[in-house]
A protein has these predicted regions:
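C-terminal helical subdomain
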Residues: 175, 179-182, 187, 195-237
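Conserved mid-core segment of classical short-chain dehydrogenase/reductases
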Residues: 70, 90-109, 150
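Conserved glycine-rich cofactor-binding loop
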Residues: 15-16
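Conserved glycine-rich Rossmann-like NAD(P)H-binding loop of the short-chain dehydrogenase/reductase
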Residues: 29-46
């Protein structure tokens, strides 16, 4: 059953994992959605599923592509602007992950383009579609702050995104800008990080979603949060 929320969110990386789980939750709560992902078939499957609940525009493409970002901005204008942007799309890099002294620099540049530059580029493309008080959620990782051996490429990119979020918040007090660590999850990206390992003991992405919903619908100040800690602190939503 949907609620009466009259808001629109754009979610990148929304064809599976955390992005899809969040999209489903917001659709059930009455949010209109603009969804992005690189894989067109999976994204269209998601759109077909969620269109039974709410208005959904699905735009396949790569957030590192300027033309794709313009398409996202056009869709945001068609829906009357945005109350929220969730920068969830990211890439791990090589699997298994190399140590930094062995990391191919051209590959590392690609990780930074997707995980750091693209989220900012998306926001620049959408700046005139953001409504006053809009929420920006940049999905980071505990690898941004913990020096896990072998996680230098991905972790440092998420550290850069976390600091970018903090500065963006300081520069735009009219917006609420969050970086959020969703915690370990049973996702394809996490499986890529641990090739050959059974990750069935990791929580499903759905367990982190209530924390993200709290950021999107609550009254928390800009800052960095841990999604599952928010769930416990707020008693769920």
């Amino acid at each position: 059953m949907t609620t009466d929320i009259d808001s629109t969110a754009l979610i990148t990386g929304a064809s599976r994992g955390l992005g899809l789980a969040l999209a489903r939750s917001l659709a059930q709560r009455g949010w209109a959605l603009i969804l992005d992902a690189r894989g067109a078939p999976a994204l269209q499957d998601a759109r077909a599923d969620l269109a039974n609940l709410t208005t959904v525009i699905a735009i396949p493409g790569d957030v590192t592509d300027a033309g794709h970002r313009r398409s996202l901005a056009t869709a945001a204008g068609e829906l009357g602007g945005l109350e929220a942007v969730v920068n969830n799309a990211s890439i791990l890099g090589p699997s298994p992950q190399p140590q930094l002294l062995d990391y191919p620099l051209d590959v590392l540049e690609g990780v930074y383009r997707t995980n750091v530059i693209a989220p900012l580029a998306v926001l620049q493309a959408l700046r005139y579609a953001l409504k006053p008080g809009a929420r920006i959620v940049n999905v980071t990782s505990d690898a941004a702050v913990e020096p896990y051996p072998g996680w230098g490429g991905y972790g440092s990119s998420k550290a850069a995104l976390q600091q970018l979020s903090a500065i963006l918040a300081a520069e735009n007090p009219d917006l609420r800008v969050y970086s959020v660590d969703p915690g370990d999850m049973r996702t394809q990206l996490h499986q890529q990080a641990f090739p050959g390992e059974d990750i069935c003991d990791r929580p499903l992405p759905e367990e982190s979603v209530p924390g993200l919903v709290e950021l999107l619908e609550g009254n928390l100040s800009s800052g960095h949060y841990e999604a599952r800690a928010l769930v416990h602190a707020q008693g769920g939503r």
